[in-house]
A protein has these predicted regions:
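Short, small-residue-rich loop/turn micro-motifs
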Residues: 57, 263, 267, 353
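TM-adjacent membrane-interface loops and short helices in multi-pass inner/ER membrane proteins
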Residues: 241, 245-288, 292, 302-303
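Glycine/serine-rich anion-binding loops at beta->alpha junctions
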Residues: 134-144, 185-187, 267-272, 361-375
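A juxtamembrane structural motif centered on a specific transmembrane helix
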Residues: 1-30, 346-393
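Short linear Ser/Thr-Pro motifs
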Residues: 55-58, 276, 367
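Hydrophobic alpha-helical transmembrane segments of multi-pass inner membrane proteins, especially
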Residues: 41-47, 52-55, 62-255, 293-354, ...
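Transmembrane helix boundary and interhelical junction motifs in multipass membrane proteins
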Residues: 188-193, 271-276, 286-288, 305, ...
Length: 393
């Protein structure tokens, strides 16, 4: 009827339906609704992580900076910035910056190179992983984690390379060798493992057969061990001390053994929040890679189980977002982020419990790190945005 006014929202929905009918048929995407269950778990883990960081870092903050809240305040500020980033990114269609991903990849690679340049890169605890800025120390490897997922997802979505054949995998392998090689030059083994895991996960989800990947891993494992022994005496000492951590409790095994003491003393119910003994100069940097040991000490087996269940719920929800994504690109980006969460969580807990050699992997949401928490929350924003576009059955 002439003169009839249609709501703008209805017009936009009709346009989306019309576009969906052009070309390949797709399911109708619902817009505007994020996965609130996923968001709730993220907020819960972030809050839990900040509380545990405050408890674990208070003695070190008081000793090193005469302020028990020193590490907490910095982490809290970065968490606020991360939440703002998460909210903004959750409202930007993830396809809008799809074509910018190659530029992100170039920038992140340049930053990894800059870390290796004396005067630009900062060396701490024997590793050169950070760049100094007026506000905080940036860790470029944290930026590379989501970018490698988006870059590989874009490559798969382009359809240029058939991942079912070896030739189609070569461009991905080449990119990964460059990135992982730069990170190994920084002596950042843990970051290299995580990024390689993210890349391989996206490749497998994109069509790479699993069997060749497993064969390649079995071939590379002994080569990697030989390389570690030849190039890094410190890291080889970590491997050998893993075999029998109590044989050398004053040197390479010291942190692992103190972490095991913390886990064992927690029992089932823990010593109580804030009541850890090991964080008082016994366990080095308890607010970093070994914060899970403090969780076990203060909250016991029950508290540790709650943390593990929360991470499991988050990862399962992220996989669900990947399965319901409306396109290949969104699905593979979600797979990459879910893989990062899973790899880091499993490795961190495995290191804390001396199930694998000490690699220095941070526990998401819990371990101290400004760049890490900001980047992680922005990644959660990407997943929330993908969930806005999830398809209806």
């Amino acid at each position: 009827m002439a003169g009839t006014a249609y709501p703008k929202r209805a017009i936009k929905q009709n346009r989306r339906t019309t576009r969906a009918k052009i070309g390949k048929p797709v399911k109708l995407a619902r817009m505007g609704e994020i996965d609130y269950t996923f968001l709730f778990i993220v907020i819960l883990l972030l809050s839990f992580g900040l509380v545990m960081l405050l408890s674990a870092s208070a003695p070190a903050g008081n000793t090193l900076h005469n302020n028990s809240y020193y590490f907490f305040n910095k982490q809290f500020l970065c968490a606020i910035l991360g939440l703002i980033g998460m909210w903004v990114i959750s409202r930007i269609d993830y396809n809008k910056y799809k074509n910018t991903v190659p530029k992100f990849m170039i920038v992140c690679t340049i930053l990894l190179v800059c870390v290796l340049i004396p005067g630009l890169g900062v060396k701490l605890n024997g590793s050169r992983r950070w760049l100094n800025t007026p506000f905080l120390q940036l860790q470029p490897s944290e930026f590379m984690k989501p970018v490698i997922a988006m870059y590989f997802a874009r490559l798969v979505d382009s359809g240029k390379y058939n991942l079912k054949h070896l030739k189609g995998n070569l461009p991905y392998i080449g990119v990964m060798l460059i990135v992982v090689g730069l990170m190994l030059m920084e002596t950042h083994l843990s970051g290299a493992i995580v990024i390689a895991g993210i890349g391989v996960s996206v490749m497998i989800a994109g069509g790479t057969p699993i069997k060749p990947v497993l064969i390649g891993a079995l071939i590379l494992l002994p080569i990697g061990l030989i390389g570690v022994r030849a190039l890094s005496g410190v890291r080889w000492a970590r491997v050998t001390s893993f075999m029998n951590p109590f044989a050398d409790i004053r040197d390479e095994s010291y942190q692992v053994v103190q972490g095991l003491y913390a886990i064992g003393s927690g029992g089932i119910f823990g010593l109580g929040l804030g009541q850890s003994v090991q964080k008082y100069s016994y366990l080095p940097e308890p607010y970093n890679d070994f914060i899970f040991a403090i969780i076990c000490e203060e909250l016991g087996l029950i508290g540790a189980a709650v943390v593990i269940l929360l991470f499991a719920a988050l990862i399962i929800r992220a996989i669900r977002i990947a399965m319901n994504a409306p396109d290949t690109y969104g699905s593979l980006v979600a797979v990459g982020i879910a893989a990062q969460l899973a790899i880091q969580t499993i490795l961190n807990i495995a290191v804390a419990t001396s199930s694998v050699p000490n690699t220095g992997v941070a526990l998401p949401f819990f371990s101290y790190g400004g760049t890490a928490i900001i980047t992680l929350l922005c990644e959660m924003g990407v997943l929330l945005n993908i969930s806005r576009h999830s398809v209806k059955d």
